[in-house]
Structure formats: structure tokens, C-alpha cells
């Protein structure tokens, strides 16, 4: 995906009791195990945006944002993430939004992850052309 492009990722998910994270990785670099991610953390009733690796001590390059989010196990949820250059916005169930910027890594690689048990469905990726 060229840097100037805008893209959107949508997916639905349900999770089982005890699941700690359902997330989407953005601009991840497998060679150095670094990137960004939006992570839904049902046990903590929040959605977070993190840059990884997470440094054990404070660092000016550390990024951490969060919003409260109350979901229930075994209920259908929808996630939409829109990325334009360095800007990313995550919408959950059209009720919670979390926006950020991503400056340090720009690999344009994405991924989905689950820590626990969850079902992901209706996974869609759309790249927007200029003027769309």
C-alpha cells in the first residue's frame, strides 16, 4: 500500500469469557518485532492503542492511549479502522472511537490477533483511490 493511500479494515467478532485481547496490528515490522496496535481488552473494559515493543521504563517514543469500552462475552461486535498516512481511527460498534498518529514505523503491514478465544468474521479490507 503506497504511503499516500487511505485504507479501511472492518471485522466482526465475538469473544468468550476470559479473553484478554482482540486486536489489529498496524505497520508491524516482523524483522524487529515492532509496530502499533489497537487492542480491545474485555477484562479491563477498554480499548487501547499501543506502540510495541513496550519499554519497561518511560520513553519519549512510548505511545499509549485508551478509552473505556464495555462489551459482553458472546455478543457480536464490529470494528472499523481507517488509516490515512500517519493517522489512524478505530471505531467499535459505532459508539467508541480512538484516534492517533503513527510516526515511527510505516511498513503498511497489518494483522489480527486474539489472546484467548474469539471468533472473527466478515473481515474486509478496502483501499481507497485518490478522490474517493
Describe these PLM feature segments.
Residues 1-132:
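Extracellular glycan-recognition regions
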